[in-house]
Each structure stands twice: as C-alpha cells, then as structure tokens.
C-alpha cells in the first residue's frame, strides 16, 4: 500500500463511490422536496427507491472495501455514511453497527418505495422491452430489468445481510429470506 499507483487507485475508488452517493443524495433531496415535479406519486416513489438503493449499494461497497471485517478482532474503524448533498459537507461517521443500521434502513426504504410502484410487477420483461407494444404512461419506466428494480433491491438486501451475518448470525436468516424472494 506504499506504492503511489496503489494509493491512487484506492483514492479513486473511494472518491468515485462518494461522488455517486452525493448524486443519489441530490436525487433523494429533490424528490422529497419537490413532489410536484413528478408526473405522479408512483414515478416519484420509483425514482426515490432507485436513489436509496444506489446509495446503499455504494455505501455497502465502502463498508466492504474500507470498513472493519465483520465479527473480526481487527482494527475498529468508523466510516462516513453520507446523506449530504454537497461535496464540501462532511458526512457523519459511524462505527460498524451504526453504519450497518443505516444500510438496512436505506434498503428497507427502497424496498417499500418500489414494492407497490415498480412496473416490473404489472408487465412482463418482453412488454417492458417493447414499450410500443403496451401502453406505459412514462417510457422512463421501461427496461426495468436494467435498473435497480424491486428484485435487485431484494438481491442487494440478501448480499448485505450475508455480509453482516459474519458479525451477527441473526442476519443469515434475513439473507436467506431476501434471496428467496428473488
């Protein structure tokens, strides 16, 4: 880790993850503050759900790459769980448990927002891939299998719970349940 190339690579990964997180936070803030900007509540919920999911996806990678080993006896670290919308704002730092709770909350929010609003439940993949063959009000809702849809959130929950299960076995059953839903 003393090599300049390695340091630059690590810094680039860390910076890019937090750049994406801040962008997701901006979407969340805008969607929560400007409901009238969306054609309907379902669209707003899908976009919010995707933003919470992408934030959690990146934050989970931050934890895996830069956090402490779950259940390990290694160095204890605190990581910033960013909910800020500006690059110059400092995010609150959390220990492993606090960080994990924030991840769980974000994915639970994403799941709830997508569960009743994601068009993936009302159409087949074929219909969503050929928006001209069915009447879909907003073409943004097409190609849902290529986005962070409800099933992707369930898979991400399973991945997160499996990772957290190394520290606390109660998460293993939750990982199984989330994976079974997919």
Where in this protein do the model-derived segments appear?
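Inward-facing hydrophobic residues that define packing positions of alpha-helical scaffold repeats
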Residues: 21-24, 100, 107, 114, ...
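Conserved, well-structured interaction surfaces
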Residues: 1-66, 92-97, 112-114
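Hydrophobic-face positions in mid-chain alpha helices that act as interaction patches
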Residues: 131-132, 140, 147-148, 162-165, ...
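Structural register within alpha-helical repeat arrays
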Residues: 48, 55, 62, 150, ...
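Structural signature of alpha-solenoid helical repeat junctions
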Residues: 40-47, 54, 77, 99, ...
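Short coil/turn linking the two alpha-helices of tandem helical-hairpin repeats
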Residues: 63-70, 118, 163-169
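Flexible helix-coil transition and linker loops at the boundaries of alpha-helical arrays
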Residues: 33-45, 113-146
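Short, flexible, mixed-charge acidic loops at enzyme active sites
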Residues: 69-82, 127
């Amino acid at each position: 880790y003393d090599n300049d190339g390695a340091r630059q690579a690590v810094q680039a990964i860390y910076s890019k993850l937090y750049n994406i997180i801040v962008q997701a936070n901006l979407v969340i803030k805008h969607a929560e503050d400007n409901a009238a900007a969306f054609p309907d509540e379902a669209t707003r919920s899908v976009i919010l759900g995707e933003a919470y999911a992408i934030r959690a996806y990146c934050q989970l990678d931050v934890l895996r790459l830069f956090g402490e080993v779950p259940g390990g006896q290694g160095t204890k670290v605190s990581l910033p769980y960013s909910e800020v919308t500006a690059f110059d704002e400092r995010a609150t730092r959390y220990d492993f448990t606090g960080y994990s709770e924030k991840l769980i909350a974000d994915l639970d929010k994403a799941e709830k927002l997508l569960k009743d609003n994601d068009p993936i439940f009302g159409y087949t993949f074929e219909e969503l891939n050929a928006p001209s063959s069915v009447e879909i009000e907003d073409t943004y809702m097409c190609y849902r299998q290529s986005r962070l849809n409800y099933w992707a959130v369930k898979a991400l929950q399973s991945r997160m719970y499996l990772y957290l299960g190394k520290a606390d076995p109660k998460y293993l059953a939750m990982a199984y349940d989330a994976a079974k839903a997919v």
